[in-house]
Structure formats: C-alpha cells, structure tokens
Amino acid sequence: SAAKIWRPSRGLRQAALLLLGRPGARGLARFHPSRQQQQQFPSLDDKPQFPGASAEFVDKLEFIQPNVISGIPIYRVMDRQGQIINPSEDPHLPQEEVLKLYRSMTLLNTMDRILYESQRQGRISFYMTNYGEEGTHVGSAAALERTDLVFGQYREAGVLMYRDYPLELFMAQCYGNVSDPGKGRQMPVHYGCKERHFVTISSPLATQIPQAVGAAYAAKRANANQIVICYFGEGAASEGDAHAGFNFAATLECPIIFFCRNNGYAISTPTSEQYRGDGIAARGPGYGIMSIRVDGNDVFAVYNATKEARRRAVAENQPFLIEAMTYRIGHHSTSDDSSAYRSVDEVNYWDKQDHPISRLRQYLLNQGWWDEEQEKAWRKQSRKKVMEAFEQAERKLKPNPSLLFSDVYQEMPAQLRRQQESLARHLQTYGEHYPLDHFDK
C-alpha cells in the first residue's frame, strides 16, 4: 500500500525521481514509467502526505463532536461487596500482601483523623486528609518496584505508608521539629524521602509533571530498568505544565506513569466546571499516550493497571496515563469547608456506600482472612501507634532558626551569611520576645 511505500525517510527522494526522471534524463518527456512502476507508485492524491498527522481524505464537511464519542469505560476487578467480578482479572495476591494493603490504608486513615483533629486544636498549622482515596495510593504503590521514583502532589501519603515510612517522620514533618528531614522549612504534608525514592512535594500545582518526565528520560538514557510515577489530581491536569509533560513524555518515549486521581473536585471546583471532554484519560491518545480509566475505589483494579503499565513502560520505553476515578470525602484541606459547595448527603453516599477501605475489608471477610475481632484489635493497635508517634513529635524542639539559611548553596554566599548574622544579632537583642526555649540551640 502507499503507506508502506512512502516512508518519511524515502518519500521525498522517490517523489523527486517521479518528477525528474531517471539519472541522465532531461525533464519529464524522457521518463516513461512502466505499468509495474505505475502500480507501485500511486497518485499522491490517494493518501494525505502531510507530516503532522496520519489520516484519510474525505469530501464531506463534518466537525468531530465530542458528545458522539462514547466515554472511556472504567476498569474494575471487584464490586462494592468485595466480590471478584471476572476471575481472570483476579491478581491472586497472597494473604499477607492483601493484609499489608489493608493495614496501610487503615493506618493512613487513622493518622489522618488524629492529625486533622490536632490541627483543629492548634497543635499543627495545616493538614490535608486522604479520606476516600486510600485505594489509589496503596494499590499503585504495591505494583511498583521500591526503586521506582515517585513524584507526588500533596495527597499521596499512602505511597510512603506502603513503603514503610516511619510514623515518627510523618509526625515530625507535620510538626516541623528537629527530627524533620526538611528541618521545618516545608508546609505540613509536604513529605520527601530519598531512601524511599519519594521526591519532596512542592505546593505549586503540576510543577512535578515535567520534572517527572525529565527524571524518566534520564532513567531511559541510563538503561536503569526503572520507571517514574507522577501523581496529580484532575485539577492539576488543567495546568499548562501537564500539557508540556504529556507531550515531552510521548515524543521522547519516556518510561513514566502519569497517575491522575480524579476525585471530583479541584478544591471547590467540580469536574463539571473544569472540563467539557471525557475526563483526563481521553486526553492521552491525543498525545500518543496509552491510557486507561480505572475504579480508584477498587484497590485490585488500581494494582493491575499500575502493574501492567509499569511492565510495558520498562519494556517499551513509553508513557502511560492512568485515570483513577474516586471521591474526595474530606475537605480539600483544613483551610477549606466543603459544606459550602457540596451536600452532606453526597459525601455520606461515598463514605458509606463506596469506600475503598470498606470494599477491601469485605473482600478479606469473604476470603476468611479477617474477622471482627481482628478488626477491633487492629484499630486499637493502629491508634496506639499513631498516638505514640504524635506525642513523641509534640515533645521535640523546633529546628534552630539559623537553619533557615542553610542547604541552598554548597557554600553559603556572603549575602546569605550577612542575613544569618543579622538574625542572630536580632534574636540576641530581642530574644525575650520570642519562644526561643521551643527551638534547638
């Protein structure tokens, strides 16, 4: 066919031979193609030769309407009662692995409740819960290798929880005490851990997307047998950085998984006001990215999709987009009151009828791997573990104020050194006006 003959590297050269004739001939009059040659090189009008798209000509004016394209289906493995729908899609995870999924999700939920209340009591300055989205974090984390690099947004604490990040460090970061690896210089919930390959979170939306693509490109060039996973919400997908990241990943063929948590709201803006197309997964094919939409409240669906995307991203050096449909049960943050823009009944429906933790618990009960006594014991144990870490973090001092100026340059510039010295003189003179006894010396 013409598509096979007119390859990008040969098309122009062959077209020139058709127009100019054989070497040594003068003009078109000396060139007489045979019947075989006429069949081999059909008219250029048969198929478009434009370099920017692969398509066919039509002779009828018609715009493509988005509402006539059927929506991308939502892949799921188990129903709301924890029953496997199609046995061939069952990941057949061993009991201990499923219990680890469940314990990670419920421990995260317990930590959320305690830290949310601590902010309301004025003990920490800010917090963001993960209620209702635990399945997206933990299910995807379980499908990754521990060395895969993670770029999060600000609602992926479950990835760190699954990777056994200590509760003490979660608490230290939220309190900004001397045990915080970030030395108290980040907002709460902006975690980072080099040892667990989790890049420190940045508040501005979507900045992590092109950064993650760059990291994936570097991994590809190094033949590292590693992928990068980049998490973001559907609201962040409206940022320009998302477009840049998607396009770079596709054209540079980077081994990356774009993991979009579509939880229904970008702070107070519902999805109906964010976009008119079919969600986020529908954007992938336009960039040349393999895409899938999954039930984010089904931890096994999330696991399967991430596992396969990871396998193919490494084997084929190409990006994948996963849109996990879920619901943000909690407020956007402790600075938000979601009752101003959504009903209590709406929230209660998702909390009571389709919660990822409830669904996985039902699966465990169906398998005979869990019972009510174990549930009560684990709830008590997990709360005790969180409270112990909480109380320990609360007793610790804040980092020394002089650390405000460190860790920016390898060698501190003179200007920063002068500022550091100025702060030290100020505190020495007016120290009685500051709670310096709460800070490390």
From Swiss-Prot:
K(+) binds at S202, P204, T207, Q208. GO terms for molecular function: 3-methyl-2-oxobutanoate dehydrogenase (2-methylpropanoyl-transferring) activity; branched-chain alpha-keto acid dehydrogenase activity; metal ion binding; protein-containing complex binding. Its EC number is 1.2.4.4. The modification Phosphothreonine is found at T334. Keywords: Acetylation, Magnesium, Metal-binding, Mitochondrion, Oxidoreductase, Phosphoprotein, Potassium, Thiamine pyrophosphate, Transit peptide. Phosphorylated at Ser-333 by BCKDK and dephosphorylated by protein phosphatase PPM1K. GO terms for cellular component: branched-chain alpha-ketoacid dehydrogenase complex; mitochondrial matrix. SUPFAM superfamilies: Thiamin diphosphate-binding fold (THDP-binding). Its main location: mitochondrion. It is found in: Mitochondrion matrix. Heterotetramer of 2 alpha/BCKDHA and 2 beta chains/BCKDHB that forms the branched-chain alpha-keto acid decarboxylase (E1) component of the BCKD complex. The branched-chain alpha-ketoacid dehydrogenase is a large complex composed of three major building blocks E1, E2 and E3. It is organized around E2, a 24-meric cubic core composed of DBT, to which are associated 6 to 12 copies of E1, and approximately 6 copies of the dehydrogenase E3, a DLD dimer. Interacts with PPM1K. The modification N6-succinyllysine is found at K352, K376. It is an enzyme of class 1 (oxidoreductase). Thiamine diphosphate binds at Y154, R155, S203, G235, A236, R261, H332. This is 2-oxoisovalerate dehydrogenase subunit alpha, mitochondrial. Its cofactor is thiamine diphosphate; Mg(2+). It holds the Pfam family E1_dh. Together with BCKDHB forms the heterotetrameric E1 subunit of the mitochondrial branched-chain alpha-ketoacid dehydrogenase (BCKD) complex. The BCKD complex catalyzes the multi-step oxidative decarboxylation of alpha-ketoacids derived from the branched-chain amino-acids valine, leucine and isoleucine producing CO2 and acyl-CoA which is subsequently utilized to produce energy. The E1 subunit catalyzes the first step with the decarboxylation of the alpha-ketoacid forming an enzyme-product intermediate. The modification N6-acetyllysine is found at K352. It comes from Rattus norvegicus (Rat). Mg(2+) binds at E234, N263, Y265. One of its GO terms (biological process) is response to glucocorticoid. Residues 1-41 form a transit peptide. The modification Phosphoserine is found at S333, S335, S343. It catalyses: N(6)-[(R)-lipoyl]-L-lysyl-[protein] + 3-methyl-2-oxobutanoate + H(+) = N(6)-[(R)-S(8)-2-methylpropanoyldihydrolipoyl]-L-lysyl-[protein] + CO2.
